[in-house]
Amino acid sequence: GLTTRQKMKKYRAFYIMFIPLFLCLILFSYLPMFGILYAFTDYTPFKPAQFVGLQNFQKLFSQAGFWKAFFNTLQISITKLVIDTLGSIVLALLLDELHFKWFKKISQTIIYIPHFMSWVVVASIFTMFLSPKNGLINGVITALGGDSIYFLANEKWWRPIFYMIAVWKDIGWGTIIYIAALSGVDMEQHEAAVLDGATRFQRVIYLTLPAISGTIVTVFILNLAKVLNLFDPVWVLQNSMVINTSDVLETYVYLIGISGSKYGLSTAAGLFKSVISILLVAIGNKLSKKLTGEEVL
C-alpha cells in the first residue's frame, strides 16, 4: 500500500482544491465561535470588554420582549416546519402519480424555482400582489364588493400570509428529495397489494410512506436544526404594525445588538437560541430512534 506521503503526492491536486474551502470553513464557521465570549461581557466597540458573568442572561430573561420573541419564534418556526414537511410529502406523492414524464419534469422545475430566489425578491413580489392600493388580490376583493385589506400590516393576517409565502418558497426542496426517495420504492410490493385488493390510499399508507420513512426523518431532523433561523423571511416582511406578532429571536437580537448597541446582550440572546436549536435536534433524534429505530445523528 501507499504511504501517507505518497497518497498526498498522488492526490495533491485534490488537496490544493480543498485548501480554499478549508480556509473559508475556519474563517466563517469556527473563528466566529469565539464571539460567544461576548455573551459574558459588557462589550462596547473601541473599549475593553468587562466580564459580567451571567448578568446579560439575567437581564435578557427579565425582559418581556425577549420572551414574546421567543414564543413567537417557536410558534412560527414549528408551524412552518410541520406545514412544509407535510406539504412536501403530499406534493411528492401527487407528482409521483403523474404518468407524463415531460409534464412531471416541468412541474418539478416550476415548484423548485422559488427555492433559488432571495427573500428580498420574494418579499417584493408578494408585497406587490398584496398591496392594498393596486395589488392583484385586493383588486379581486374590491371587484367583488369587499374592502381592501392591508395583509402585511394586519396582525390577524400576517402569520397566515407568512406561512403561505414561506411554504411556496421552500416546499420545492423537500418535494424533490421525496420524489427521489419514491423512485426507490419496490413496485413489486405495490403490484402484489393491487392483486390483494388494496386501494391506492392503503398502498400509500402501508407501503409507500414506510418505505421512505428514513428519508422523511432525515430531512425533518436537518430542517429542525435550522428551524429557528427566521431572520431573512421575517425581516423582509415585518413592519411596526405587526411587531407583536412577527418579532422573533433573530430580529430581536438584531434590534438590540445593532440598533441598541448592546452587543453582550444580543450575543447572549443568540447563544440562547443556539442552545435551544441543539436541544430540538437532540429531542428530534431521540424521537426518531424511538419511532423508527434509527438515529440520524
Where are each of the predicted segments found?
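Membrane-interfacial, low-structure loops and terminal tails that flank and connect transmembrane helices
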Residues: G1-L2
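A structural signal for multi-pass alpha-helical bundles of membrane permease subunits
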Residues: K7-L297
